A protein has these predicted regions:
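Periplasmic c-type cytochrome electron-transfer domains
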Residues: 1-148
Length: 148
């Protein structure tokens, strides 16, 4: 049987099983247009800025002096952070979004892990891990994303 071209984009191989449309019943990411104005990021709002999204989550064994996604930040501000590209996430009295509870245990549904392609943590579908972006490359990428 000839496999017709798929309308799904990205890393996708057409499904030839009994239920060929099951693989496209999935989350569809939004366009990057206006991404600078849609903080906080990830499905649960656990990353306050695009700059933080380009960083990895701190894991056990990671060096203390590295740059990581914040484990907590203030929410409720409408003040734009033009450097990190998101909403101001500190320096005012707001609600504190926490990844972990007082015991240091991760709060279910509040994880800020995943989608760490630019930090050299998440592998591509072929298993290849891309090299991490340095700070200058992250800032250059943010400048581009501001134009969308």
């Amino acid at each position: 049987n000839k496999i017709n071209p798929s309308i799904k984009h990205g890393n996708y191989d057409p499904d030839t099983t009994v239920d060929p449309f099951a693989s496209i019943n999935a989350y569809k990411a939004r366009s990057l247009n206006g991404i600078w104005a849609t903080a906080p990021y990830l499905h649960n709002g656990s990353v306050p800025t695009l700059y933080d999204l380009l960083l990895p989550k701190k894991r056990e064994g990671d060096p203390e002096d590295g740059e990581y996604r914040p484990d907590q930040f203030e929410v409720g501000s409408r003040e734009f952070d033009p450097v990190k590209v998101g909403l101001k996430s500190g320096g005012y009295k707001g609600f504190t979004f926490r990844i972990t509870n007082a015991k240091g245990e991760e709060i279910k549904g509040n994880s800020n892990a995943g989608h760490e392609y630019t930090s050299g943590k998440t592998a591509q579908p072929n298993g290849k891990i891309l090299p991490p972006l340095n700070k200058e490359e992250r800032l250059d990428l943010l400048e581009y994303l501001k134009t969308l």
